[in-house]
Design a protein with these regions (language model features):
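A recurrent domain-boundary module in secreted/ectodomain proteins
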Residues: 1, 160-167
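Short beta-strand/loop segment at the start of cytosolic alpha/beta domains
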Residues: 2-34
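Short, well-ordered coil/turn elements that cap or connect secondary structure elements
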Residues: 12, 138, 159-162
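Structural signature of tandem-repeat unit edges
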Residues: 21-24, 36-58, 68-81, 91-104, ...
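Consensus positions within tandem repeat domains that build extended binding/scaffold surfaces
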Residues: 60-62, 83-88, 106-111, 131-133
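A structural signal for leucine-rich repeat
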Residues: 132-136, 155-159
Length: 168
């Protein structure tokens, strides 16, 4: 089974994954991109490859950088990390939903996504928002966060040099 580690595969001619762990107990993959420009991306919690079920735990750096058509992204609940520049410069991206287990959003992850106006963060365990992760997004962007997390997430967004925004 270990021979699958670092192997890449594409599901449904859309998203491409790289195997990061493959044992009897742990099977994980990282999303590394897509073969073509997509309008909407839903990153699932799990994918099946060769009759094995893998948890999707990460979005790699530069995975969806400069997608010209992308307007909406939904990130599954097993993803814990969004890599640096993952959605950098996606000029039409307007809505992002971040799954409940993301703990780390990389530097410049959504930098320059000028139409990004609505970000929903479902999780209560976000530990780090990288530098400029949400810089140069729409000026009136709204971040919807879990109850009791507004202050902590607001501080992280400020440290990350986020453009003007509202947290609710």
């Amino acid at each position: 089974m270990q021979s699958y580690v670092r192997k890449t595969f594409t599901i449904g001619k859309k998203l491409t994954y790289k195997v990061t762990a493959c044992s009897k107990k742990v099977k994980t993959v990282t999303v590394i991109g897509s073969k073509k420009q997509l309008k909407s991306i839903t990153i699932p919690a799990t994918v099946t490859y060769r009759k094995m079920k893998f948890k999707v735990t990460e979005i790699s750096k530069n995975a969806f950088k400069k997608q010209k058509k992308l307007t909406k992204v939904t990130i599954g609940n097993n993803v814990t990390k969004i890599g640096a520049n993952a959605f950098y410069g996606d000029k039409k991206l307007s809505k992002v939903t971040i799954g409940k287990n993301v703990t780390n959003i990389g530097a410049n992850a959504f930098y320059g996504d000028k139409k990004l106006s609505k970000v929903t963060i479902k999780g209560k365990n976000l530990k780090k928002i990288g530098k400029n992760a949400f810089k140069k997004i729409k000026k009136s962007a709204t971040f919807k966060v879990p109850k009791g997390k507004a202050k902590a997430y607001k501080n992280m967004l400020k440290k990350a040099k986020t453009s003007s925004y509202k947290v609710k």
